């Protein structure tokens, strides 16, 4: 009854030293988040307010998108609409081609990962340089992000040091000191900023009232990516729009506290129009399924997500299986839900990667009911034709047993004889539970018989 996730997680757990480090690292981030949350008396009120803002905006998204686009055009920005990933990539390429761009630097954007923009542009002969350090590391390594906020968290400083030596970024063999490696990365990226023809940013928020794009970073790379190049392209999903700066103030107090346990991001950059050094600014608003998801009565609230990553940091399954165990490019609880919205046939294996502990709901800054939604997805697997046939057979059997008192009493009366089954048989492939658990001993008397004796 293994799923694609459980098979990948099994591979991840083969290196127990690394698996323990991965678990402890994310729990430390969760602890920092808790300390920050407990330091604000109004934390729960902020969560409720943030949830209300996102709910209101998404249920009135057509109005706010129109307001945003109108304001952006008044600011002198060219606004584009992309219905899907293919159109988004074509729009980006068209803009770059019109400006004779050969090299583009960009800050971190999960939207461009979603649309497969980098490989598309590279196939057209345009060099794309990731400038977020974590993203740059995995770009050089040819990997995808394993976390939406800390994309290279699965690599340690020795991995990065060896990579930098291989790519010629580091010139001191064996020096894997993080401070030194960061310094060498800065030197390497500095030339890219100065020689790029275009800069691209994502956007944490789009302000409908003013047409502004707001980007939060800890490295200042969004500012650097838009300071020297003469062209700035900003790309955001439709759900990133919020009404005004009063609403932004709520999210700015929560985003970094929830995601990394910091009071705020080091840099919060506001882009209303092309910077003095740039000649042109374009904003691309991307649908790629979002307008359809809004109509999903049970799961549309996943669009409230502000991509802080806190649900991953706390999730016991993500912490112990890693980001690459999931089939969707966003892992963890939010990735399970978004992946199912995207393609339930392709990503249904991820819904098993949840204990339903609901810790994700406890920490989510916008009060997303992630665990409840995952439970609902599980109930729908048969409708999608992806329910596990073995589980279906077992459930039918259990339904028969629990639906008949005589069958139930007969079964519980025989249960203790399972204690005498030889261990190799009990732990064989027919019993997947035994792969990760020690089988319990069955009592001689079932609970309902013990209760009867006690009540005499």
Model-found features: residue ranges?
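The feature marks the mature, well-folded catalytic cores of soluble enzymes
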Residues: 1-298
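Intrinsic disorder at enzyme termini
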Residues: 1-25, 29, 39, 394-456
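Helix N-cap / loop-to-helix initiation motif
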Residues: 84, 311, 369-370
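Ferredoxin-type iron-sulfur electron-transfer modules in oxidoreductases and energy-metabolism complexes
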Residues: 275-302, 317-427, 431, 435
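Short Cys/His-rich zinc-binding micro-motifs
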Residues: 305
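Accessory "access/gating" subregions that flank catalytic or transport cores
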Residues: 309-312, 319
């Amino acid at each position: 009854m293994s799923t694609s996730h459980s098979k990948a997680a099994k591979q991840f757990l083969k290196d127990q030293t690394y698996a323990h480090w991965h678990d402890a690292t994310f729990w430390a981030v969760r602890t920092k988040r808790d300390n920050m949350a407990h330091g604000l008396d109004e934390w729960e009120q902020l969560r409720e307010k943030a949830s209300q803002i996102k709910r209101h905006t998404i249920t009135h998204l057509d109005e706010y998108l129109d307001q945003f686009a109108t304001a952006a055009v008044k600011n002198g920005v060219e606004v584009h609409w992309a219905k899907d990933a293919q159109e988004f990539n074509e729009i980006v390429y068209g803009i770059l081609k019109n400006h004779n761009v050969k090299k583009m630097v960009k800050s971190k954007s999960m939207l461009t990962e979603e649309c497969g923009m980098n490989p598309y542009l590279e196939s057209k002969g345009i060099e794309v340089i990731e400038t977020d350090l974590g993203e740059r590391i995995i770009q050089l390594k040819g990997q995808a992000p394993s976390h939406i906020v800390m994309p290279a968290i699965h690599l340690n400083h020795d991995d990065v040091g060896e990579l930098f030596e291989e790519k010629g970024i580091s010139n001191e063999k064996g020096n894997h000191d993080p401070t030194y490696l960061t310094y060498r990365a800065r030197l390497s990226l500095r030339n890219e900023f100065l020689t790029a023809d275009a800069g691209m940013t994502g956007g944490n928020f789009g302000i409908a009232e003013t047409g502004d794009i707001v980007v939060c970073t800890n490295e200042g790379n969004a500012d650097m990516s838009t300071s020297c190049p003469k062209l700035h392209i900003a790309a955001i999903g439709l759900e990133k729009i919020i009404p005004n700066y009063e609403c932004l103030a709520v999210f700015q107090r929560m985003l970094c506290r929830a995601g990394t346990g910091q009071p705020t991001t080091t840099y919060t950059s506001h882009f209303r129009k092309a910077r003095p050094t740039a000649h042109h600014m374009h904003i691309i608003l991307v649908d790629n399924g979002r307008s359809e998801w809004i109509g999903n009565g049970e799961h549309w609230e996943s669009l409230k997500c502000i991509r802080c990553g806190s649900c991953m940091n706390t999730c016991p399954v993500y912490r112990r299986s890693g980001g690459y165990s999931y089939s969707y490019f966003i892992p963890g609880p939010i990735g399970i839900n978004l992946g199912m919205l995207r393609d339930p046939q392709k990503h249904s294996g991820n819904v098993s990667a949840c204990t339903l502990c609901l810790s994700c709901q406890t920490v989510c800054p916008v009060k997303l009911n992630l665990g409840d939604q995952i439970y609902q997805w599980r109930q729908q697997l048969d409708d999608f034709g992806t329910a596990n046939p073995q589980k279906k057979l077992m459930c039918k059997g259990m339904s028969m047993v629990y639906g008949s008192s005589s069958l139930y009493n007969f079964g519980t009366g025989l249960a203790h004889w399972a204690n005498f089954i030889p261990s190799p048989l009990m732990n064989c492939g027919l019993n997947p539970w035994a792969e990760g658990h020690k089988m319990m001993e069955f009592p001689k008397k079932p609970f309902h018989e013990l209760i009867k004796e006690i009540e005499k």
